[in-house]
């Protein structure tokens, strides 16, 4: 049997596997590996934080610790208000190279003004600060923005804590497309169905998802606007309609159709118009991924006799082979800067996440598990979210692009698959 066709059937079979799922259950995150060198930072309580029903700084601390790049210096019950310069030498003596000072100011409308400043204790300088307005219910969203600020100031890269992830879970005959914060909290159901849901893909605006639903008793591609719940059919041609991926302009999608026989790549507008076939191949072409500059579409194909990754100009033209090591490399996903390619490779019989430097063509295997699938880069390119198996059930995991930081995200007694990491939207 054709190896890519076999893979498609295996993925569909995995989507049909049933384990119990509690609606609105949260993903729990276990840190299984951290960076070799972590930056020591202190995040004491904000002034007046006790007036909130739920805190802020505990979420900031959890975000930074989860990244694997920071170690937290305990400040006890010390409160450092945003209006004063803290004793930086004293904080430095506790072992922190940076410290965050903040205050909450209640407003007449029930909201809070949150002000904070970040200091470098070594150089005895202020690194910057912000003022944010929030309701008490927005404590977690505000905390994620603060953590992003700290992350960017101390690493030079944008943070990813205020982003969202999409994934699919299974409960008996019920499938749910879930949306959650990057830390697994605030999970919401975007779509529930008694038929499989696969291949969620975020639009660049972070407001829409494309996915494949089998509710019509066949795979059909939909685009779903999350704020309104409205959705429309993008591809419902004869045969299979699958593997949607957005162009960087947010106006077009690449999809895989079998309407003319084998699985082949097509591009069409997000409203379903303007269908254009990308190439003609005697084999199976599938799993497209657009490059961030919009110039290339990467995809999996067996056209050369084994499952490998190719790319084709988005404007049309001849395909070029990208992977050459091994005889099974599939599911290409480009880093946000376009410099790296994440994919699934078969290594000694194990399916693992690998990353290729597209300039040097050097490939590094990042995981040590055996049934990985569906890699998805964080919007800053630092982490890669993917699906794997643990204890006989599907879980999500994340690994840093250098392989040093590792996390596992799971739901108690639930099967979780098909992850997709949303874009930065601020």
Curated annotation (Swiss-Prot):
It holds the Pfam family PD40. GO terms for biological process: cell division; protein import. Keywords: Cell cycle, Cell division, Periplasm, Signal. Transmembrane segments: none annotated. It is found in: Periplasm. The keyword Membrane does not apply. Its main location: periplasm. Gene3D superfamilies: TolB, C-terminal domain, TolB, N-terminal domain. GO terms for cellular component: periplasmic space. The keyword Cell cycle applies. Residues 1-25 form the signal peptide. It comes from the Bacteria. Part of the Tol-Pal system, which plays a role in outer membrane invagination during cell division and is important for maintaining outer membrane integrity. HAMAP family: TolB. Belongs to the TolB family. The Tol-Pal system is composed of five core proteins: the inner membrane proteins TolA, TolQ and TolR, the periplasmic protein TolB and the outer membrane protein Pal. They form a network linking the inner and outer membranes and the peptidoglycan layer. This is Tol-Pal system protein TolB. It comes from Aromatoleum aromaticum (strain DSM 19018 / LMG 30748 / EbN1) (Azoarcus sp. (strain EbN1)). The gene is tolB.
């Amino acid at each position: 049997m054709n190896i890519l066709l076999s893979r498609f059937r295996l993925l569909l079979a995995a989507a049909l596997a049933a384990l119990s799922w509690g609606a609105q259950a949260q993903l729990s995150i276990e840190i299984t590996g951290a960076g070799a060198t972590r930056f020591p930072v202190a995040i004491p309580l904000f002034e007046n934080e006790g007036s909130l029903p739920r805190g802020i700084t505990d979420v900031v601390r959890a975000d930074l610790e989860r990244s694997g790049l920071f170690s937290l210096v305990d400040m006890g019950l010390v409160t450092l208000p945003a209006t004063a310069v803290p004793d930086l030498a004293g904080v430095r003596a506790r072992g922190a190279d940076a410290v965050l000072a903040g205050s909450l100011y209640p407003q007449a409308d029930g909201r809070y003004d949150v002000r904070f400043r970040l200091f470098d204790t070594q150089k005895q300088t202020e690194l910057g600060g912000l003022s944010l307005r929030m309701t008490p219910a927005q404590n977690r969203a505000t905390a994620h923005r603060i953590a992003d600020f700290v992350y960017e100031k101390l690493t030079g890269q944008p943070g990813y804590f205020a982003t969202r992830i999409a994934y699919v879970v299974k409960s008996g005959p019920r499938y749910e497309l879930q949306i959650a914060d990057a830390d697994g909290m605030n999970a919401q159901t975007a779509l529930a169905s008694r038929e499989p849901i696969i291949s969620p893909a975020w639009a660049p605006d972070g407001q829409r998802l494309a996915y494949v639903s089998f509710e019509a008793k066949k795979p059909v591609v939909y685009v779903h606007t999350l704020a309104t719940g409205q959705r429309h059919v993008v591809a419902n041609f004869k045969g299979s309609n699958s593997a949607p991926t957005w162009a960087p302009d947010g106006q077009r999608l690449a999809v895989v159709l079998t309407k003319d026989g084998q699985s082949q790549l097509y591009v069409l507008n997000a409203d379903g118009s303007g269908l254009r076939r990308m190439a003609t191949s005697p084999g199976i072409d599938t799993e497209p991924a657009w490059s961030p500059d919009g110039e290339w579409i990467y995809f999996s194909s067996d056209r050369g006799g084994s499952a490998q990754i190719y790319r084709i100009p988005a404007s049309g033209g001849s395909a070029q082979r990208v992977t050459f090591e091994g005889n099974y490399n599939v599911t290409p996903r480009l880093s946000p800067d376009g410099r790296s390619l994440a994919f699934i490779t078969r290594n000694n019989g194990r399916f693992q996440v690998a990353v290729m430097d597209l300039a040097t063509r050097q490939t590094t295997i990042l995981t040590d598990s055996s049934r990985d699938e569906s890699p998805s880069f964080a919007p800053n390119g630092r982490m890669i979210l993917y699906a794997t198996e643990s204890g006989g059930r599907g879980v999500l995991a994340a690994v840093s692009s250098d392989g040093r930081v590792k996390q596992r995200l799971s739901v108690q007694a639930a099967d979780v698959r098909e992850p997709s990491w949303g874009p930065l939207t601020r």
